[in-house]
Amino acid sequence: LWDCERSLAELAALCEANHMEAVAEVTQKRQTPETGIVLGSGKLEEAAAAAAELGAECAVFDGELTGSQIRNISTALGGLEVIDRTMLILEIFRSRAVTNEGKLQTELALLRYRLPRLQGMGESLSRQGGGGGGGGGARRGAGETKLELDRRHVHARIDALAEKLAEMEKRRGESRKA
């Protein structure tokens, strides 16, 4: 049986482990979550007011959110960064990784988790790039949205990290044989 108080206490402890202070809690008992925003609009307004009053820098949700939910909630909260429990846990692992391999593994896990949620992160991810303007590999092509560009960069980083990790694994295997 899910215990709301215990889960929120654990979430507050996770925030603390990530050097964040939980300044308010907004809960709602619903049969089914609101599809696009998880909370009802009244509770979301309550959360927005609390966040503004307390100067919150981030809203942490106790559960997994989709990219569109992150975007919708962030918009309703006045552009506040929105993360879910899993992202918070991955951030904790990333910040505590010590070895080079551990750092690469946690960055890879975080990128793989964030990739399908990119549409909800940051602002104006749907803006289109213009054409022209010579050179520059990181530029957007004509009609390429910022979201598409971000996805391309994340895919490239994921590929590079996976390659580095495979290389490390191969070297470790070779040194064991020697």
Residue ranges and their predicted role:
Residues M87-T106:
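Short alpha-helix plus adjacent loop in nuclease-associated cores
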Residues A12, E16-H19, A52, S74, ...:
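Signal for well-folded cores of large energy- and translation-related assemblies
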Residues W2, T32-I37, R96-G102, R139, ...:
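Flexible beta-alpha connector loops of hexameric P-loop NTPases
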Residues V98, Q105, A109-R112, P116, ...:
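Short amphipathic alpha-helical segments with heptad-repeat character
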Residues M121, L125-A178:
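Conserved G1/Walker A P-loop phosphate-binding module
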Residues L1-L90:
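N-terminal accessory targeting/assembly segments
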Residues E64-G78, L104-Y113, G130-R139:
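Short secondary-structure transition/capping segments
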